[in-house]
UniProtKB/Swiss-Prot annotation:
This is Holliday junction branch migration complex subunit RuvB. Mg(2+) binds at T67. Pfam families: AAA_lid_4, RuvB_C, RuvB_N. It catalyses: ATP + H2O = ADP + phosphate + H(+). Its EC number is 3.6.4.-. ATP binds at L21, R22, G63, K66, T67, T68, E129, D130, F131, R172, Y182, R219. The RuvA-RuvB-RuvC complex processes Holliday junction (HJ) DNA during genetic recombination and DNA repair, while the RuvA-RuvB complex plays an important role in the rescue of blocked DNA replication forks via replication fork reversal (RFR). RuvA specifically binds to HJ cruciform DNA, conferring on it an open structure. The RuvB hexamer acts as an ATP-dependent pump, pulling dsDNA into and through the RuvAB complex. RuvB forms 2 homohexamers on either side of HJ DNA bound by 1 or 2 RuvA tetramers; 4 subunits per hexamer contact DNA at a time. The keyword Aminoacyl-tRNA synthetase does not apply. Residues 1-182 are annotated as: Large ATPase domain (RuvB-L). It is found in: Cytoplasm. Residues 256-334 are annotated as: Head domain (RuvB-H). It comes from the Bacteria. It comes from Bacillus velezensis (strain DSM 23117 / BGSC 10A6 / LMG 26770 / FZB42). Residues 183-253 are annotated as: Small ATPAse domain (RuvB-S).
Length: 334
């Protein structure tokens, strides 16, 4: 799969950059108004009662700020955050080591929590409910179970696939918050804030232009800003103007709706070879040279979100909006 400027996933280098941009409290966090308002109440209530915050599940598409919100929860509660991920916890012993190292009140953040296997989930259940850990010592007939007390802690889980969580795990979270895509106004504010952190001068119009092409995702907005900054430094006087931003984004092949060359290839392939569909997923896969699961999990969600694709029982179909976007005449439908 080609690397994409508009991908909502972060690589390891980008994760380091994101840490430097991360707001430290709810007041600094832009967007997700309802989620913030509810978390404010839950955090303040827990602090007033001098209790740990209830376990929190953050879910929604990648790149919307789940990790950032987890760190803010820890900051607002005045505690440390320990970070791990579902794939990194391979054995129950791995989870036991993490849990026994927690201090009272700590936040344990598990990213991609839907990827925990069942045996690890079973260790997690009593830890979440009763703050205890059941450990089996020995093997065979002489094996015995020992219960260890754990300090009270808050588990913050993050997932892009909430439907893959088992019901017993999902039901143990007291706070469930869905993160939504951001508005252009919110993304414009995020671009301006990031530019301030980078000490880059940017006008309102180019900040809006970058926001418009960011697919509703702060991670994409910040990535595009970094690339536009490169063009401003090399081709201009380091100030990001509307002209510089427009020229840079065109060179980067990110169009006015945030579609890149791969989106164009997929959509135009469906139009030119299959008259817009319906087309089966395997056929699209063979046409553009990508795995079916990559198309379904990576490319399709945004196209579905903006109404450019429809899933039907007979296959994928491009909508009239695609023809309008590419300035093509839509074929007559039966």
């Amino acid at each position: 799969m080609d690397e994409r400027l508009v991908s909502s996933e972060a690589d390891s280098h980008e994760s380091i950059i994101e840490q430097s941009l991360r707001p430290q409290n709810l007041a600094q966090y832009i967007g997700q108004k309802k989620v913030k308002e509810n978390l404010r109440v839950f955090i303040d209530a827990a602090k007033m009662r001098q209790e740990t915050l209830d376990h929190v599940l953050l879910y929604g598409p990648p790149g919307l700020g789940k990790t950032t919100l987890a760190s803010i929860v820890a900051n607002e509660m005045g505690v440390e955050m320990r970070t791990t991920s579902g794939p990194a916890i391979e054995r129950p012993g791995d989870l036991a080591a993490i849990l026994t190292a927690l201090e009272p009140g700590d936040v344990l953040f598990i990213d991609e929590i839907h990827r925990l296997n069942r045996s690890i989930e079973e260790v997690l259940y009593p830890a979440m409910e009763d703050f205890c850990l059941d450990i089996v010592i020995g093997k065979g007939p002489s094996a015995r179970s020992v219960r260890l007390d754990l300090p009270p802690f808050t588990l913050v889980g993050a997932t892009t696939r909430v439907g893959l969580l088992t019901a017993p795990l999902r039901d143990r979270f007291g706070v469930l918050s869905r993160l939504e895509y951001y508005t252009q106004e919110e993304l414009t504010d995020i671009v301006s804030r990031t530019a301030d952190v980078f000490e880059v001068d940017i006008e309102k119009a180019p900040a809006l232009e970058i926001a418009r092409r960011s697919r509703g995702t702060p991670r994409v907005a910040n990535r595009l800003l970094r690339r536009v900054r490169d063009f401003a430094q090399v081709l201009g006087d380091s100030r990001i103007t509307e002209e510089i931003a427009h020229d840079a984004l065109e060179r980067l092949q990110v169009d006015a709706l945030g579609l890149d060359h791969i989106d164009h290839k997929l959509l135009m392939g469906m139009i030119e070879k299959f008259s817009g569909g319906p087309v089966g997923l395997d056929t699209i896969s063979a046409t553009i040279g990508e795995e079916p699961h990559t198309i379904e999990d990576v490319y399709e969600p945004y196209l579905l979100q903006i109404g450019f694709l429809q899933r039907t029982p007979r296959g994928r179909v491009v909508t009239p909006a695609v023809y309008e976007h590419f300035r093509l005449e839509a074929p007559a439908r039966d």
